[in-house]
């Protein structure tokens, strides 16, 4: 699996249309690089767009399910923070997240997540999430329900949402050795799973480092493995 482009519109801190194209310079041959910027500039939102377009969810939304926080919406309604539509920028009527990628089959696909409000107005109630999957190599659209299409995407890229989070996004603090909530056996298995996923993704992903924080991952894995080895 190789990511070719990330696009979106009106998502959280990123207003209007945006695009990151890895098929043109300076990113085409950049190798590993950093996404930097001040707080609120859209770094995390860019990663959210990637996840939404592939999985209709993000790591932050997964964590929000535990807290069950409700956010204020229009017309005195609320929306769960864990709802993927909550990423739609306030004061806008529509938004989308889109990713072009090369699947394990070698074919190029485009997955698109959309959110909109009734009547095309910022004051309209939220409509159901839309999801499309196009086979760009064959110029055909995959058919199925949103759930079926999401399952298709996971199969095409060879990673589930959980595996993607562990081996690609590597959310900060997820592998902390001093996390009391994780038993040693769970830590060991997680290290094995992540290690396998990272080797796999880098191998087929042409070492595209925009999101694969490889150096950080390897350092943390070595640290965790060293701690595990100290246990009789």
Spans of model-derived segments:
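Alpha-helix boundary/capping motif
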Residues: 184, 188-190, 194-197, 207-209, ...
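A short, flexible beta-alpha/helix-coil linker loop
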Residues: 28, 174-175
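Acidic side chains
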Residues: 21, 48, 180-183, 193
